[in-house]
Amino acid sequence: MKRTYQPHNTPRKRTHGFRARMKTKNGRRVINARRAKGRKRLSV
């Protein structure tokens, strides 16, 4: 049986990357929340 997670960097960056987050209002909210929490990595 084929596993569900087949990693590829391009779609990963496109959907969860920093630039993708900055495109939307809610994405920016995610980044700010992670900054406030003190996350080492803000995005993928």
UniProtKB/Swiss-Prot annotation:
State a GO cellular component annotated for this protein: ribonucleoprotein complex
User: What InterPro entries has UniProt attached to this entry?
Assistant: Ribosomal_bL34 (IPR000271), Ribosomal_bL34_CS (IPR020939)
Q: Which family does it belong to?
A: Belongs to the bacterial ribosomal protein bL34 family.
Q: What is this protein called?
A: Large ribosomal subunit protein bL34
Any one GO molecular function term: structural constituent of ribosome
| Pfam families named among the record's database cross-references | Ribosomal_L34 (PF00468)
What UniProt keywords apply to this chain's record, in alphabetical order? Ribonucleoprotein, Ribosomal protein
> Please, one GO biological process term?
translation
Q: What is the lineage of its organism?
A: Bacteria, Pseudomonadati, Campylobacterota, Epsilonproteobacteria, Campylobacterales
What gene, per UniProt, encodes this protein? rpmH
Q: Origin organism of this chain?
A: Helicobacter hepaticus (strain ATCC 51449 / 3B1)
